[in-house]
Amino acid sequence: MPEALYFTDSDEANRLIAQEPLALLISFAIDQQVTVQQAFTGPLKLRERVGTLDAPAIAEMDPATLETAFRTPPAIHRFPRAMAQRVQALCQVVVDEYGGKAERIWTEATDAADLRKRIGALPGFGKMKITGFGSVLALHFGVEAAQELVPEYPCLGKINSAEDLAEYQAAKRAHKASLRAQASA
C-alpha cells in the first residue's frame, strides 16, 4: 500500500485515498464532471462532515443528512444530491456484497475478468472508471488481477507526483478531443 497517491493538492487527502480503501472507491465514484482534485478530496470532506468513512454507517445514514454533507459549501460535488445517492448506494453494495470491506472487491477477485465484473457492478463505474480504477490498483497497490485493466492511454494509475497529475490532465484533454474528432469525422 502506498503512503500517498498524488491526485490532489491536499497531503491529507492524498494519504487518505491511499490508506483507506473506501475513500479511494468513493473518489472514483464521484470522479465525473468535476476536477480530479475535487473528486479525490471528496472523501476527506465527507469524513470531516459526517464523522466517518465506514461503509455500513454511510449506507444506513439518513439520505438528507448525507446530501447536506455533499451540498454544504464548499460542495463536495457540483451535483450533491446525485453523488450523495451514488455514494450511499455504493456503500450499500460494499456492505451487502463485501461485508462492509471495500478492499474485498479486489483482494478476493480471482482474475481480471472477475475484477472487471466486480468493479463494473458498482454504482457509477463504467468502462473508463473500470480501467482507471484498475490501473491504480495494479500500479500503486500491486493487485495482480488488475494488471490487464491498465490502459495504454494516460490514466490515474500512472501518476506518481503533482507534475504527473498536471501532465495527465493535459493528456486527458487531448485524448478526449481526439475521440470527439474521430466521432465527428
Where are these regions (language model features)?
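Short, aromatic/basic-rich helix-turn unit that serves as a nucleic-acid recognition element
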Residues: 25-29
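Short alpha-helix boundary/capping elements
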Residues: 33-38, 51, 95, 141-142
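Structural motif
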Residues: 12-23, 33-35, 77-82
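Short Gly/aromatic-enriched secondary-structure transition segments
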Residues: 40-46
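Alpha-helical ds-nucleic-acid-binding substructure associated with the helix-hairpin-helix region
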Residues: 46-121
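C-terminal accessory module of base-excision DNA glycosylases/AP lyases that mediates lesion recognition
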Residues: 1-15, 19, 112-121, 127-185
